[in-house]
């Protein structure tokens, strides 16, 4: 399965090193939907490129799209294609049968309240020790699937193409359109 990650990229970093496409930034985690940094690190990926870029641009709704929005910590944002081994299993939170088995409600999965989603993720991580991660729908577009990959699945990941994001990148334009972000001239 090919997934996508939008991340701050250091071109000279190894894939699994700090600011590489397969780096699990556990030391900086704690605010994200499924973060539990005392137990695991995770990567936030998506089934389509636009979904992960939308996640990066969401904080800038109502602003003009400028090149500074495409930088984090002085590094350019990049889009990486990441292959998850076909043998990997995901806990699919978009599957009604899974929600029933796990005694989860869709509203609790979709909430932005981290006091709800982080304990859910920790429980799933512990109950499914062979799961590579979690799959759920994007809060920006329900047809987009987001995937949280746990660090225990790092060996199941391979990096494909990496593109530095620019204002004229087609995926940036598509993602900016979701929020009505307009290019500064």
Q: What are the residue ranges of the model-derived segments?
A:
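Active-site and NAD+-binding cores of ADP-ribose-processing enzymes
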Residues: 1-32, 63-185
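Extended catalytic/binding region for NAD+/ADP-ribose chemistry, centered on the ART fold
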Residues: 33-64
